[in-house]
Amino acid sequence: MNTVDFSKGLVPTIILDDQNGEVLMLAYMNQESYQKTLETGYTWFFSRSRNELWNKGETSGNTQKVKQIWTDCDNDTLLIRVIQTGPACHTGKKSCFFNLIKEDF
C-alpha cells in the first residue's frame, strides 16, 4: 500500500463518480481528514477558508461513500471514487465542473 505524502500539509483530492467516472469536485485533504476518511468510509476534507475539517454531506445530506482511493505517481495527489448521494457541488449541480471555457480545439 502506498503512503500519501503530506509533507506539504495538504494534498489535492479529485473526487470521481464511481458509476460513470465523471469528475465531481476537487478538494484538499490533510493527514487528519484522510485518516477520518479511511476510518468512516465517507469523504472528509480540510477547508482552507475555514481552516477546519469538514465531512462532505454532513449538513446537506449529499454524502460521498468511498469505493476506491488512488494516489498519483508522486504520492502527493489523491483520486477517490465515490458513490455520490445528491449533487456534489454546493450550487446544486451534480459536478463542480460545469463552466465550459472552450471546446473544439
UniProtKB/Swiss-Prot annotation:
Its main location: cytoplasm. Zn(2+) binds at residues 73, 89, 96. Mg(2+) binds at residues 72, 74, 76. Keywords: Amino-acid biosynthesis, Cytoplasm, Histidine biosynthesis, Hydrolase, Magnesium, Metal-binding, Zinc. Binds 1 Mg(2+) ion per subunit. GO terms for cellular component: cytoplasm. It catalyses: 1-(5-phospho-beta-D-ribosyl)-5'-AMP + H2O = 1-(5-phospho-beta-D-ribosyl)-5-[(5-phospho-beta-D-ribosylamino)methylideneamino]imidazole-4-carboxamide. One of its GO terms (biological process) is L-histidine biosynthetic process. It is found in: Cytoplasm. SUPFAM superfamilies: HisI-like (SSF141734). Its cofactor is Mg(2+); Zn(2+). The keyword Hydrolase applies. InterPro entries: PRA-CH, PRib_AMP_CycHydrolase_dom, PRib_AMP_CycHydrolase_sf. Its EC number is 3.5.4.19. It holds the Pfam family PRA-CH. GO terms for molecular function: magnesium ion binding; phosphoribosyl-AMP cyclohydrolase activity; zinc ion binding. Pathway: Amino-acid biosynthesis; L-histidine biosynthesis; L-histidine from 5-phospho-alpha-D-ribose 1-diphosphate: step 3/9. Belongs to the PRA-CH family. Catalyzes the hydrolysis of the adenine ring of phosphoribosyl-AMP. Homodimer. This is Phosphoribosyl-AMP cyclohydrolase. The gene is hisI.
